[in-house]
Swiss-Prot record:
This is Ribosomal RNA small subunit methyltransferase A. The keyword Protein biosynthesis does not apply. Its EC number is 2.1.1.182. Specifically dimethylates two adjacent adenosines (A1518 and A1519) in the loop of a conserved hairpin near the 3'-end of 16S rRNA in the 30S particle. May play a critical role in biogenesis of 30S subunits. GO terms for molecular function: 16S rRNA (adenine(1518)-N(6)/adenine(1519)-N(6))-dimethyltransferase activity; RNA binding. The keyword rRNA processing applies. The gene is rsmA. Its main location: cytoplasm. It holds the Pfam family RrnaAD. S-adenosyl-L-methionine binds at residues 28, 30, 55, 77, 103, 122. It comes from Cereibacter sphaeroides (strain ATCC 17023 / DSM 158 / JCM 6121 / CCUG 31486 / LMG 2827 / NBRC 12203 / NCIMB 8253 / ATH 2.4.1.).
Amino acid sequence: MASIDGLPPLREVIRAHGLSAKKQLGQNFLLDLNLTAKIARLAGDLTNSDVLEVGPGPGGLTRGLLAEGARRVLAIEKDARCLPALAEVAAAWPGRLEVLNADALEVDVAARLTPPIRIVANLPYNVGTELLTRWLSSDWPPFWESLTLMFQKEVAERIVAKPGSKAYGRLALLSQWRTDPKIVLTLPPDAFTPPPSIHSAVVHFTRLEAPRHPADPKVLARVTAMAFNQRRKMLRSSLKGLVPDIETVLREAGIEPTQRAEEIPLEGFCALARRLAG
């Protein structure tokens, strides 16, 4: 990458700026520019897209996104220590990188970017699931075209899990209802500085123009929350507070009242949400 953007290797960057990953911010720096370039490529053709990156740290993935031709990158970084390193990246790519020192949970991203928009990020471990849930719960179709996101491997496996598995739950349902998520890369702990105790994985989410099955989002969210908060209980017990005769409603949706949440596919939960909605 240095031959492309003229910037030094990332280990030199963090040494020059005295950067070390902060555990309380969920940081783990990915310093291999070959890997950051690979993640940028996995996001697809960026040449006509604006890109949102959350938690760029010293700018390794940022450099990959710019080198892959992203029209413009908005990098939101909460840690002010990283700003000088990111300013150097911005100087190497004039007019194409905006760095915002802010909490990504508090930024109206859609107002700052021009469609088409892709989100590509090595998400801080402590906010990754919350950010994903927000992006998947917005009005549909959303402001973004695709998501290419790094998570702890355990979280990535929950996203792509199928019914009947221990990993299957609300995150799988929310992800698979309106996107096609796939694990596209797995990374060992020693790819990061400092090495985390777990493996990481990159998930690419392809947006669907409409949900796989019709359902009211709020009703579906309520049903799945109640079902999976007591996932080992039979649905006639975990959902008994929804309506007076939950067993009848379950059967009308094609679900046996003695089944448990982890046995019910997405289509079944959507059918149940439709019955409850009216």
